[in-house]
Curated annotation (Swiss-Prot):
Recorded family membership: Belongs to the FliQ/MopD/SpaQ family.
Organism expressing this protein natively: Buchnera aphidicola subsp. Baizongia pistaciae (strain Bp)
Gene Ontology biological-process entries: bacterial-type flagellum assembly; protein secretion
Pfam families recorded: Bac_export_3
Entry membrane topology: Multi-pass membrane protein
Name of the protein described by the UniProt record: Flagellar biosynthetic protein FliQ
Length: 90
């Protein structure tokens, strides 16, 4: 394996990881921001109030984006196994 092939594998793995995790992280971020603004406006300082909506938002985003994330991950895995002989013997 050459340096270029290792870097290409690492780049593709990081790209797939970011593509899969980004919808979940963005939904948790937006939900946390909205709940924090609500808590600041109403002066409610309850820790569980910010935790429960984040879990719900992540679960909803898994339901919405789950099939897309599964297609991305299975395509990457298929490509990785298809090119396995090239990766190990070059």
């Amino acid at each position: 394996m050459t340096i270029e092939s290792v870097m290409s594998l690492f780049y593709d793995a990081m790209k797939v990881t970011l593509m899969i995790s980004l919808p979940l992280l963005l939904s948790a971020l937006c939900c946390g921001l909205i709940v924090s603004i609500f808590q600041a406006a109403t002066q409610i300082n309850e820790q569980t109030l910010s935790f429960i909506p984040k879990i719900a938002a992540v679960l909803v985003s898994i339901v919405i984006f789950g099939p897309w994330m599964l297609v991305i991950l299975s395509d990457y895995t298929h490509t990785l196994f298809y090119n396995l002989s090239y990766i190990t013997y070059s």
